């Protein structure tokens, strides 16, 4: 409001200077007087003084407001510094308290017992690793042994089957080589001349070489199979 009044007053002075209607009217009428001129000068001077006072007062208010704002800023800055200092002090205190508690707890720890516990744990882990390594070695050796027996058994079974097939193929020639055919011919002669129970006995004697050959083959096969399973 005061600022508006100050602006209006300055505009009035400017208008009075640019449009001196009073002086022009006096000159045109031809009735000016020294008292009237003095009165106008006094009014202008009073108006200027009043406007100067308003300007000074307005500037004083501006300075006062500026001082108030600066004071408020200083107070806010001081409060922020104080709050920051309190926060830093509390953080440092919490850290120191934590370190003190940790050091106090560490004083009650028996380092020798801790070393013994760690040593036993390391020794136990080492033993477990050695045991597992031995088991792996035994498993590997057992696997190699089984693999060896497997190949050996397969080869032996093939050999037995080949021998059996050879025997069945050459039949009589093999029997002649072992002189089994001579024995069978003698048994056949006895079989023709025998009667009753002796006939049955001679039949068994005649087929006994074949039974022995089959039994030998079965026994060899079972022996190879047992070795493979072991």
UniProtKB/Swiss-Prot annotation:
<protein>
    <recommendedName>
        <fullName>Uncharacterized protein C</fullName>
    </recommendedName>
</protein>
<keyword id="KW-0614">Plasmid</keyword>
<feature type="compositionally biased region" description="Polar residues">
    <location>
        <begin position="18"/>
        <end position="42"/>
    </location>
</feature>
<dbReference type="Pfam" id="PF03904">
    <property type="entry name" value="DUF334"/>
</dbReference>
<dbReference type="InterPro" id="IPR005602">
    <property type="entry name" value="DUF334"/>
</dbReference>
<feature type="region of interest" description="Disordered">
    <location>
        <begin position="1"/>
        <end position="42"/>
    </location>
</feature>
């Amino acid at each position: 409001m005061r600022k508006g009044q100050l602006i209006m007053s300055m505009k009035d002075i400017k208008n009075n200077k640019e449009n001196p209607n009073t002086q022009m009217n006096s000159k045109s009428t031809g009735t000016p007087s020294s008292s009237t001129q003095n009165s106008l000068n006094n009014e202008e001077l009073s108006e200027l003084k009043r406007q100067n006072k308003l300007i000074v007062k307005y500037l004083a208010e501006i300075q006062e407001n500026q001082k108030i704002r600066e004071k408020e800023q200083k107070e806010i800055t001081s409060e922020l510094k104080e709050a920051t200092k309190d926060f830093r002090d509390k953080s440092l205190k919490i850290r120191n308290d934590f370190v003190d508690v940790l050091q106090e707890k560490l004083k009650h720890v028996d380092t020798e017992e801790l070393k013994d516990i760690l040593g036993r744990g390391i020794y136990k882990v080492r033993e477990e690793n050695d045991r597992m390594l031995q088991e792996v070695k035994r498993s590997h050796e057992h696997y190699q042994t089984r693999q060896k027996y497997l190949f050996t058994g397969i080869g032996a079974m093939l050999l037995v089957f080949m021998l059996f097939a050879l025997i069945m193929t050459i039949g009589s020639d093999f029997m002649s080589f072992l002189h089994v055919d001579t024995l069978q011919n003698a048994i056949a002669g006895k079989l023709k001349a025998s009667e009753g129970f002796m006939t049955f006995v001679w039949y068994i004697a005649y087929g006994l070489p074949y039974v022995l050959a089959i039994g030998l083959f079965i026994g060899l096969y079972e022996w190879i199979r047992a070795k493979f399973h072991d």
